[in-house]
Regions:
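His-Asp-centered catalytic microenvironments across diverse enzyme cores
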Residues: 2-10, 14-22, 39, 83-194
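Generic structural hydrophobic/aromatic packing signal, biased to beta-strands
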Residues: 30, 34, 70, 78-80, ...
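Residue-level preference for nonpolar/small residues embedded in alpha-helices
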Residues: 26, 62-63, 106
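Cysteine-centered nucleophilic/redox motifs
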Residues: 55-82, 114
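Secondary-structure boundary elements
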Residues: 1-57
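Proline- and acidic/polar-enriched loop/turn elements at helix boundaries
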Residues: 46, 82-83
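Short Gly/charged-rich anion-binding patches and loops
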Residues: 29, 65-68, 109
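Short amphipathic alpha-helical patches
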Residues: 54-61, 93-94, 137
Length: 194
């Protein structure tokens, strides 16, 4: 049972048409389709349709696409959120060796998801749920679909820089970003079974 407005896709705009071409006619069908696609970084994140073109995506591209679908179909109650949470060995076991190697308890990670009223909607992968990150959520803000690229990266890097200073982390922002990239690569490889 869905606890959100499962609207029919009725718009004649680009994203709605791309879903209709795949015989997907409601938001819940679109969300389940997107959730079933593999987790992998897209080739051209600036194209909002990249998930449908590549047949895979990340939390950013998948949720931005669903938000754009909601916009096209005049459903403003669906909000695209960017949260910063503590990514650590308990909520992301695949990165435990990397964090241990660098003697880090956690690293702040930016995550995108949708909110419908007070309900958190998570469509990153088949197994992902809000419980994966909500207990460790540090902050969140609403963003626009086009902000999942440059804006998200800048915001995330600024957050890590502040965290590094406040916690006296013995790495530069560049080193921390590289550690984070290694964690994400490790996670992607585990998710893809590589």
């Amino acid at each position: 049972m869905n606890y959100y407005n499962d609207f029919e896709i009725a718009s004649g705009e680009r994203i709605s048409i791309l879903f209709a071409e795949r015989n997907i006619y409601t938001f819940s069908e679109a969300a389940q389709y997107i959730k079933s696609l593999p987790y992998k970084r897209n080739k051209n994140k600036k194209d909002i349709a990249c998930v449908l073109i590549d047949n895979y995506g990340t939390c950013s591209t998948k949720h931005a696409l669903l938000k754009q679908l909601a916009i096209e179909n005049e459903q403003p109650e669906f909000k695209l959120m960017m949260g910063i949470y503590k990514m650590h060995a308990c909520n992301t076991p695949h990165i435990a060796p990397m964090l241990h190697a660098y003697k880090l308890e956690y690293i702040p990670e930016a995550h995108n998801y949708l909110r419908y009223n007070n309900l958190i909607l998570e469509f990153t992968s088949k197994k992902s749920t809000p419980a994966d990150f909500i207990p460790d959520l540090l902050e969140e803000s609403e963003i626009l679909p086009e902000q999942v690229t440059d804006f998200k990266i800048c915001y995330h890097r600024d957050y890590i820089s502040q965290w590094q200073k406040q916690e006296n982390i013995p790495y530069s922002i560049e080193e921390l970003w590289e550690i984070r990239e290694k964690c994400i690569k490790s996670l992607s490889e585990q998710v893809l079974g590589a």
